[in-house]
Curated annotation (Swiss-Prot):
Oligomeric and partner information: Component of the CBF3 copmplex, which is formed of CBF3A/CBF2, CBF3B/CEP3, CBF3C/CTF13 and CBF3D. CBF3C interacts with CBF3D and SGT1.
Main location: nucleus
Entry protein name: Centromere DNA-binding protein complex CBF3 subunit C
Keyword Transport in record: no
Top-level division of the source organism's lineage: Eukaryota
Species per Swiss-Prot/TrEMBL record: Saccharomyces cerevisiae (strain ATCC 204508 / S288c) (Baker's yeast)
CDD domains noted in UniProt: Ctf13_LRR_LRR-insertion
Record's GO cellular component terms: CBF3 complex; kinetochore
Region (Disordered): 206-251
Amino acid sequence: MPSFNPVRFLELPIDIRKEVYFHLDGNFCGAHPYPIDILYKSNDVELPGKPSYKRSKRSKKLLRYMYPVFATYLNIFEYSPQLIEKWLEYAFWLRYDCLVLDCFKVNHLYDGTLIDALEWTYLDNELRLAYFNKASMLEVWYTFKEYKKWVIDSVAFDELDLLNVSNIQFNIDNLTPQLVDKCLSILEQKDLFATIGEVQFGQDEEVGEEKDVDVSGANSDENSSPSSTIKNKKRSASKRSHSDNGNVGATHNQLTSISVIRTIRSMESMKSLRKITVRGEKLYELLINFHGFRDNPGKTISYIVKRRINEIRLSRMNQISRTGLADFTRWDNLQKLVLSRVAYIDLNSIVFPKNFKSLTMKRVSKIKWWNIEENILKELKVDKRTFKSLYIKEDDSKFTKFFNLRHTRIKELDKSEINQITYLRCQAIVWLSFRTLNHIKLQNVSEVFNNIIVPRALFDSKRVEIYRCEKISQVLVI
């Protein structure tokens, strides 16, 4: 069997390399834990036992000298000593690998959408760009100078020219409160806020221990011992485990997280910021839906920042309209909303802004579709059974890419049974719910209440996508 030739691979067209990197999904080496999804799907998680072999001198040296440097990011994987040992072996050379660097170059050309963007982090007493895989494990890291030189291919670059680097993430979920403040302080000093295109919130603000963190004195902690760093990281990990509960109550409308507050106050300086990601229902209510903002003066996202945002991603919550209405109209330029791992979504309780374009719902347990059918029944003055008799089957052979044809039937209204004016009124009722929405995607949805009714214009232009939704039996096109 011929060996792999990296030089020939790098000579391939970028489209082919892009597909290869897409399927790698950010896993560049053999040292990676099980996907996080397994923890949610299985009641029993098999943990590796203690290593039965005797560690080599090299492994002992790596653990003694290298592990303390990365302990902040590795201690959550201490359940698997073999995994950490293997990771330390890769740590020396993986960041210099030609295929890894080429992957980041292609990812940069696609604006960080191929394998996700890099994140600002603080490692070995220096601000760095890091890439975390889907299991939140650190893969590689670079200084900003290395990233521009090796990835962006600008050897003689002007350090003040940041126009071509504006898609970096700032993810407080992968940072301790102390590191959040260190990163933000250095980003401000080096005038690097313009490189941030996305901010991710996910730490739990209900845990009181974080209140005691002194933001002003956090920089004095740079030379803290590895053991104290591990303890801080473990406390941070425990906080993240609580934030998925998504409890919203009158007694819990105070924003107390130092990490979140410090980040919010720096967001106006992030001129390239276009996307916000929020994990957890309470943070969503406070930061996105603005319930309880009067109880948090100076701790909410400003109007200037809201006008810059064109994409919001929400995940890990029971429902987004628990307080009555999910109002996104304050986000004037919001164009895309992604809802992931939400237990229940009522589309009738969501209000979109006037420039809204795209809605994606994936890994959702239950969706209540717009009450379009109910309004059409009133317009036609017929009951549900009579209305169903007006359905005719659509020729769905050309939509195999967008629908599960084994389970989903595409139907339309029989125009021969109703006059043209009535049909146009039915179309108007459909568009009254969709408004400016011109793309909708459903993926891994368990159940949908109300019949799914979509506009003919969106359906014919393939802007209605349904994947892996076995419970969706039919879609009505009007």
